[in-house]
């Protein structure tokens, strides 16, 4: 196991991963056969020992007990080996684990087999994405939007946003801009995963759930922007280019951001170090933009640490606004009220960060798309905090899979791109899932290629609003009750 994260992530949430390409699936079979042989040898010697020590009746009791336990565990083992051998992608493996297909992984050997299977899938996926991305080309580009900004929030429960009806003032700057008619707030947006790394893979890939071919056959969208002459800059407070040494990568999604060749192909620039608070990341953005001067076409991707646990570490003490007394009417234990207050403070500080991003682009011909990767349980519909990695109920999906998405246009952009502004304005009630986020960005840029699909862009007249929105790759969000 290799820990692929920085010191901050280690202190907040310890995660271990496997990252090696030397094992393939046939070696999993060999290991399993060796394990089976050892198991048979053990039972053979156990049987001989029983025959010497115990009379026939006791032997029958032991055999019956072992047989009963075998039958009891058999369904879990069948599901486990289905997980091991019938799943084709890393996303499918994770989706099946949330349906308890890994329940049979009760021993270190089982977990080793599963880890090797995940490693094999990941290696194959990375190779395929490499090829699809590096070979991708465009047909044309009108540069409809010269400066596009994608802001990706982290662990944002939209139901704790004043913008979406939360009673406390967690987003005063956004609320003020919305009241002034500056924001186009989308009402019905969901994410396919409640795991950041998987969301990144889904959002960056031009593949979406429902495509016949697997995700490895599709390129990552930033390459099309680079082919079109955009300078693509990636500012992240989580995924840093130096991978193991400086930032975080992840087998199941963010791994492509840790690949040097792929990263260089996708981005003209990436920041080299994270900032403790998100406002520090915005300072890095400003310093870089000032250093390079005017660039005709840019795509800036800004990835915040947002409201990632631990909530109290996401804002400076001077930004503390809410206290446990603000939640007295909910009759919660003080410990829970304190956590909610910290989360709401992180959300309010995030609002300040977002407003500083808007201010930075206010005088450019720019459009900003804000979306969060996933939500979070904060003692609302369910008496829990964090995320539940299981097949979701409707209540869980409301908190963890519904995400905020809004679009802001600068005064110059509103003046020169009235058609797009009108299309955005008329689309805010469209149901949308962010695995098609790349299609929205391609539409805004006017990029045409074999990968462009206007039926997946929520502001296009060709948009297919009836497409199933599958979370975990299996569960239809709109059919949850």
Feature-to-residue mapping (PLM):
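Transmembrane and membrane-interface helices of multi-pass
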Residues: 1-96
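Short glycine/proline-rich turn/loop motifs
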Residues: 202, 264-268, 329-339, 417-423
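Active-site-proximal alpha/beta segments of enzymes that process anionic O-linked groups
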Residues: 71-328, 402, 433-434, 438-464
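A short beta-strand-to-alpha-helix junction
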Residues: 212-219, 337-348, 392-403, 414-441, ...
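Proline/Glycine/Serine-rich low-complexity intrinsically disordered segments
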Residues: 2, 11, 158-161, 174, ...
């Amino acid at each position: 196991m290799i820990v692929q994260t920085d010191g901050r992530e280690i202190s907040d949430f310890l995660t271990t991963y496997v990252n090696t390409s030397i094992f393939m699936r046939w070696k999993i079979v060999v290991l399993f056969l060796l394990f089976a042989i050892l198991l048979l040898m053990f039972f053979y010697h156990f049987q001989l020992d029983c025959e010497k020590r115990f009379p026939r009746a006791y032997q029958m009791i032991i055999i019956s007990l072992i047989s009963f336990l075998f039958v009891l565990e058999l369904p879990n083992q069948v599901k486990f080996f289905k997980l091991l051998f019938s799943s084709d992608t890393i996303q499918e493996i994770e989706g099946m684990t949330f349906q308890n297909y890994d329940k049979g992984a009760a021993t270190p050997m089982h977990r080793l087999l599963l880890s090797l299977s995940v490693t094999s899938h990941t290696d194959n996926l990375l190779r395929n994405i490499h090829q699809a991305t590096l070979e991708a080309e465009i047909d044309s580009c009108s540069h409809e939007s010269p400066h596009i900004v994608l802001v990706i929030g982290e662990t944002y429960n939209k139901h704790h946003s004043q913008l979406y009806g939360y009673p406390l003032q967690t987003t005063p700057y956004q609320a003020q801009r919305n009241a002034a008619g500056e924001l186009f707030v989308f009402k019905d947006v969901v994410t396919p995963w409640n795991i950041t790394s998987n969301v990144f893979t889904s959002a960056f890939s031009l593949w979406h759930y429902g495509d016949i071919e697997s995700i490895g056959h599709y390129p990552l969208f930033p390459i099309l922007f680079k082919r079109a002459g955009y300078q693509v800059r990636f500012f992240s407070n989580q995924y840093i280019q130096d991978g193991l040494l400086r930032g975080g990568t992840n087998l199941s999604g963010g791994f492509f951001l840790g690949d040097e060749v792929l990263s260089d192909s996708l981005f003209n620039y990436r920041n080299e170090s994270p900032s403790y608070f998100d406002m520090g990341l915005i300072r890095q953005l400003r310093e870089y933009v000032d250093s390079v001067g005017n660039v005709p076409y840019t795509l800036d991707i800004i990835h915040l640490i947002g409201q990632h646990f631990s909530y109290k570490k996401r804002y400076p003490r001077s930004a503390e606004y809410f206290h446990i007394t603000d939640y007295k009417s909910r009759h919660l234990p003080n410990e829970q009220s304190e956590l909610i207050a910290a989360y709401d403070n992180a959300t309010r500080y995030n609002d300040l960060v977002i407003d500083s991003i808007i201010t930075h682009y206010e005088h450019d011909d720019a459009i900003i798309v804000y979306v969060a990767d996933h939500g979070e349980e904060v003692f609302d519909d369910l008496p829990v905090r964090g995320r539940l990695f299981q097949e979701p109920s409707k209540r869980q999906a409301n908190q963890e899979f519904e995400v905020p998405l809004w679009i802001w246009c600068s005064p110059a952009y509103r003046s020169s791109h009235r058609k797009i502004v009108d299309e955005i304005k008329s689309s805010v009630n469209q149901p949308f899932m962010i695995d098609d986020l790349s299609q929205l960005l391609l539409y805004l840029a006017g990029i045409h290629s074999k990968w462009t699909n206007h039926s997946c862009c929520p502001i296009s007249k060709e948009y297919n609003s009836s497409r199933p929105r599958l979370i975990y790759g299996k569960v239809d969000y709109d059919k949850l009750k």
